[in-house]
Each structure stands twice: as C-alpha cells, then as structure tokens.
Amino acid sequence: MILLLAVPVAATPPERPLSFTKLWTHSHTTPGQLSEIPAFDRRTNTVWVAGVVGVDVLDGETGTLVEHIDVTGYGLVNSVAIHNGLAAFAIEAGPPDRRRAGVVVFYNTRTRSRIGDPVTVGSLPDMLTFTHDGSKLLVANEGTPNAVADTAYTAPDPPGSVSIIDMETRTVIATAGFDNVPQFGTNLRTNVGMDFEPEYIAIDKDGTRAFVTVQEANAIAVLDLSLNAFTEIIGLGAKDFSLPGNEFDPRNDGTVTFINANAYGLYMPDGVASYRWRDRTYLVLANEGDFREDNADRATAGNAPYFAAAPLDRLRISNTDSSPGNLYAAGARSMSIRAVDGTLVYDSGSILDTEAHNRRVYDDGRSRDKGVEPEGVALLDVGGRTYAFVGLERATSSAIGVFDITDPYAATFLDMIVTPGDLSPEGLAVFAFRGGFYLAIANEVPAVGATTTHTTLYRVDQAKH
C-alpha cells in the first residue's frame, strides 16, 4: 500500500523567494514547426527547440532564429538533448507507419552539422537524455500503434523499450524491454504490449539508475545502468478524490466547482525528474494521465454499465479499471514526490487546479477529462533550495506551477507563472548560465487567433532581502 505522508500546502509565503522576468518570446514560423521540447547549449548560448518537422536553434540572448534544422528526411522529431556540444534528436518514422523503428541523429552544436550516421532505435522514440558523464544516451521508445480510433485494438502494437546508446561508439549496446520484469505496487496496468509505453526518463545523481515513467501502465520502471536492464516496475496506486485536499471538478458544465466525490485518479505520470535530499533520491512526477491509443480504453461515467449520477456523470473514466460504483479516471491533476520504491511522500492535491482557477486560466472544458493536466517537470537549484517547475498543458494561457521541494516531506506551492498569448507548455528546460538562472518554456499549441507556437525564456531571480 502506498501512503500519503505529506499534506499539500497551498498558501503563498508573505514574500516570494523567486521572481520571474520574461526576456523574450520566439514565434516559430517554419511551416509545420511546433515548439515542443527545449534544450540549452552553454557552449553557444543557444536554445534548441524540437517540434515535428525540425529543430529551431535560437539565440539565447535575443530569441532570434539562428537556424532551422530540417529532419523530415528522417521522420518527425519528438525530442532533443544536449551534452558537451553534442545535440541528439529523437526522430520517429512518422506516416504512413509510425510503428517502424525510429532513429537518433547527432549534431555538432557549433557548426550545426550532422555527425555520423543515424542510429536506429525502437518504435516511436519520444524522449532521450544523456547520462551525467555523457557516456550513454537513453532513448524512451514509446511504441504506440497507428490506429487511434481502433476500438477493437487489433492494430499491431509495437513493444515499448529503452534503447541504450554507447556514446564512444554511437551504437545501441542494449534494448531494455519489460518482459519478465518483477512487478510491485498497486493499480499497475499489466498488459505489456498495450500499456508499457515509456514516456520520460530521469537519472539519479550517481548515475547508476534511471527511472522511466510508463504512463499508460500507471507505473515507474527502474533501469539498472550497470546491467542495462529493467529490474522492477512499480504500480503507483490511485488518488482518492473523496479525501479533503483532493477536490476536483468532474463536470464541464460552464461552472467551476471543486468538490470531493467518490472517484479515484490513476496517477499515470508523464514527466519525471530526480533529486537528492539527505542522501536519498526522490522522484518528482507530473501526474497528467493518459488513456491508451484506442477508444475502448475510455468511457463516460454516466453511461452504461456505470450509470453514475451527477456530479460524476460526465467524468471520463477508464473502461479497463472501472466498475459500477468504483470509478477510475486518468491522471491525478497534481505533482507528486515519491521515494524510489514508489512510496508517496507528497502530493499537491487540488493546488494546481485551484491556483489556475484563482488566476483565471482554468479551462472548465477540460474538467471532465484531467483538469489542468500537469505535463512536464524541471528542477532548479537556487541559493541552496530546490524548486520544481510544473507545466500545465490544459490551461487557457501557458501556466507553470512553482514549488519549493527542498524537503520532499514539506513541499510548498510558491507561485504560478502565467504567460498570456502562449498556450499548452509541452516541455521545460531550466539552466544556470553566467551567474544567472533561466527557464525555457516550449508551448506547443498556437494561442487563440494565432497560427504559430511560441518558445519563451524567463530569468529566475532570488528575492532580495
């Protein structure tokens, strides 16, 4: 059983420890280019932004476009990571068959020229990250099927995996899969082919383990980097929306009302980051929630066979996990902190939804689904404190929740960064450079009335006392 040991704290301290100054916004104008995942290169002071048809390289000081790198000859780019002047792009095969093997392509960040041949990895490489010493590159191959509307789910579904690339030879030395991996925890969705789809990877400080979110399975998988294999899969349990502090709005009825109700939310995290506190590793998770890529995995609580009454009648729930009177929705609408064994030590409860509503950026049209949908998380150390930045994919303006998580058992909500004119932050990058601290936000959806997506850079400053 996973226990909640910390109560969410929503009150903002009298004096905020951080302030945020918007430095620039870049509008991505190349046809088909979106703003999805940013990465910073300190050798050239540039921000690299992956977004479907290519990667835009932006001047870190001004936000102007340095170069657009087209990748359509390889497929569609999902992510970018940079280490010591080397950029790696995760590229899926794309139409007509995204189940085919993807590739990783490397670029020199100074010359912006390709290095070597593409490296073939698994199906739909969705995210990648270097180990701290740069010796390995880990690639999360999500392995989703083509037919998103296939209610019978008969389309071949490629297995999810993590490709491990040795950076000295730039070859795949192992592909970590999920067959026969020991399973622990609760509410683990265990259809290996359909549910075990890696989303995001975080590496612990000593570089011995990686923690992989397996969103549709409601799990974290632990990857041993000496064995290059998964050693355990941990089910993350479910959030009880009937408990005080876990209020949510289950109806898209034009009125925002946060209530406690007899329903549960499968955590199903997307983004994950790791940090140390008192010589122990903790994981920070953005509990977005996601159904499988087929309509058979979702239902409406008021319909047969559930027949839930208002206010739960419009709630979207999991067909796989729910039964009449026992409803499970996708996502926890929160940020959580867990020990590496899956123990829940903090959950933000209803804070992200309610704070978005307080700032008039809560979208009631998403209430029946997953609320603000916490998507990504990035951690920044400033002045001896550790701060978590949590991107909210489904607000009416780009919104980032900010928490002080220095002590994981006493995490505190601090602020929410709202950027009018931007929408749907997909990826975040935080970095220190030349004595300053920065937050880059990749917003993947054009704002209302706009035709392009934006990347925005903020400077993060400590409050002066």
Where do the PLM segments sit?
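N-terminal signal peptide c-region/cleavage motif recognized by signal peptidases
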Residues: A6-P8
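Beta-sheet-rich non-transmembrane sensory/scaffold domains
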Residues: T12-K464
